[in-house]
Amino acid sequence: RWALMRHHSGTHVILRAAKEVLGPHIHQAGSQLSTDTARLDIRHYTHITPEQLKQIEIVANRLVMENLPVMIKVESRTKAEQKFGFALYQGGVPPGKELRIVQMGAEVQACAGTHCQSTGEIGPIKLLRLEHIQDGVERVEFAAGFAALEAMQHIQTLLNTSADTLSVQIENLPASVERFFTEWKDQRKEIERLRAKIADLELSRLEGVMVNGTEVVIKQVDVSRKELVTVAGAVA
């Protein structure tokens, strides 16, 4: 229950952070909660950049550390709309003449879900993945509280394992991976060059014989399928 509450309150905080970073036009297109992770679909006119995602994460955690009270009250729909506007309706319009209003700082939504009593209870927020799911909608996957800690520990384990495998420090991983990838591409080109040379050598050794007035080339060669196609094409 606590994990779900942290993730639910986390969607409100991340949406507010997205508004601060990207602009007030940001609107929630949907969300999904679980105990391990949660996701928030955001309406935005263009792709969110990695730098913007980083800033959203910083702002979200700042709002958590401010320990803002989560205020919940019930108001008539008319009064709530007059006070807060239609931005109340994030992810859908709830039915009924009265609305349950959830407010965390400047973020105010009509919401019937369970929440933490303050943003500080959410704990750390870690944005895990960004996905462009359709035109105008970006999906942010995140973890909050102990789930965020577990996600960060998992990421750290992957980094440590990768660094140990390549025998480098973690901060040198990007450069090392790029170097290995460049070397792999160069070696692949060299292999292709040598295969072409082998095909040329095999071709130079072929001799034809006449069978019923037709020249036929028969030879068993130990080459790859690609090289065999090259040789056959040259003979033809």
Please report, for each region that a protein language model flagged, where it lies by residue:
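Active/ligand-binding-proximal structured segments within catalytic/core domains
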Residues: 1-42
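Ordered, soluble secondary-structure elements with a strong preference for glycine-centered loop motifs
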Residues: 4-9, 46-54, 149-153, 222-229
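Terminal appendage regions of diverse proteins
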Residues: 25, 35, 119-236
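Non-catalytic interaction/regulatory segments
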Residues: 36, 42-133
